């Protein structure tokens, strides 16, 4: 006959195997206690109960072992984490980044080299009288250039030689580098009227005030002086005693100048001839008469 089909609505057979051992023992001994009081039956019941108890104790031991193993793994993970933190010196969580940066700046400031003292005095064991730089106050130009450009530091080497340079490798006290000087972007501006008043007060008190009458007199005198100078230049030019500059000469002889066209040269000696004749006549007229 084919096996009977499992009734609908009943649980999974596999779940029955997962029942409590005590319940399984009770199911196995159901009816045996009341069926017969023989020794064999009682022994069978005790054996079933012992097996159920042993099965229950195995499950309990397995659970206890699993719990202990998990606790050991947790403790091992915590110990490994603490070892890594101690190895890499991690920053404590209570220390804020701001405090860390402040400490970093303090360390950097303590390692900064002093520009106003010669570090060679700390790096040498020579007596004072044998140090080449001890008898001068002149600052080394290479040292000053390195300070201005920001290249001076603990590893900087002087082109003259650190221990052989005869000049100071230290700035005078109170000296301010050009790169540290604050540029004044705000320039003081004054008005034209204020500038005129300032310049007028600088002239002093012993001056003639400018009036309309004084200005007219000065203007007329200046015009007369210019006309007189022009007349003198014309008279001197007529007698050949011209002291004209190059510019004045060309401006007064524009009609006598010429241009060279192509490769041909056109020389006009008429002007030169007239000037030579005028000069000769002037010399003859001014020559003293000698009696024979």
Swiss-Prot record:
A zinc finger (C3H1-type) spans 134-172. Gene3D superfamilies: 6.20.400.10. InterPro entries: ZC3H15/TMA46_C, Znf_CCCH. The keyword Phosphoprotein does not apply. Residues 1-76 are annotated as: Disordered. Transmembrane segments: none annotated. Its main location: cytoplasm. GO terms for biological process: cytoplasmic translation; poly(A)+ mRNA export from nucleus. Pfam families: DFRP_C. It is found in: Cytoplasm. It comes from Schizosaccharomyces pombe (strain 972 / ATCC 24843). The lineage of its organism: Eukaryota, Fungi, Dikarya, Ascomycota, Taphrinomycotina. Functions as a component of the nuclear pore complex (NPC). NPC components, collectively referred to as nucleoporins (NUPs), can play the role of both NPC structural components and of docking or interaction partners for transiently associated nuclear transport factors. Active directional transport is assured by both, a Phe-Gly (FG) repeat affinity gradient for these transport factors across the NPC and a transport cofactor concentration gradient across the nuclear envelope. Involved in the export of mRNA from the nucleus to the cytoplasm. This is mRNA export protein 33. GO terms for cellular component: cytoplasm; cytosol. PROSITE patterns: ZF_C3H1. GO terms for molecular function: zinc ion binding. Residues 9-26, 58-76 have a biased composition (Basic and acidic residues). Keywords: Cytoplasm, Metal-binding, mRNA transport, Transport, Zinc, Zinc-finger.
């Amino acid at each position: 006959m084919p096996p009977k089909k499992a009734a609908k609505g009943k649980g999974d057979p596999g779940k029955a195997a997962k029942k409590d051992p005590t319940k399984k023992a009770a199911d196995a001994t159901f009816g045996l206690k009341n069926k017969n009081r023989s020794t064999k039956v009682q022994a069978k019941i005790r054996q079933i109960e012992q097996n159920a108890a042993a099965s229950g104790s195995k499950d309990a031991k397995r659970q206890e072992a699993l719990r202990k193993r998990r606790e050991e793994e947790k403790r091992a993970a915590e110990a490994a984490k603490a070892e890594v933190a101690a190895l890499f010196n991690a920053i404590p969580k209570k220390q804020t980044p701001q405090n860390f940066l402040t400490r970093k700046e303090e360390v950097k400031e303590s390692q900064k080299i002093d520009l106003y003292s010669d570090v060679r005095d700390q790096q040498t064991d020579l007596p004072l009288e044998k140090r080449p730089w001890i008898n001068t106050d002149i600052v080394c130009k290479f040292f000053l250039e390195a300070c201005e450009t920001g290249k001076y530091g603990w590893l900087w080497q002087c082109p003259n030689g650190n221990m052989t340079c005869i000049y100071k490798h230290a700035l005078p006290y109170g000296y301010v580098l050009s790169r540290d000087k604050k540029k004044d972007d705000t320039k003081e501006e004054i008005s034209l009227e204020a500038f005129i008043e300032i310049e007028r007060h600088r002239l002093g008190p012993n001056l003639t005030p400018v009036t309309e009458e004084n200005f007219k007199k000065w203007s007329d005198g200046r015009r007369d002086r210019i006309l007189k100078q022009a007349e003198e230049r014309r008279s001197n030019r007529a007698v050949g005693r011209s002291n004209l500059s190059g510019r004045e000469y060309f401006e007064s002889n524009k009609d006598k100048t010429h241009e060279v066209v192509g490769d041909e040269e056109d020389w006009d000696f008429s002007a030169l001839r007239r000037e030579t004749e005028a000069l000769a006549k002037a010399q003859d007229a001014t020559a003293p008469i000698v009696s024979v």
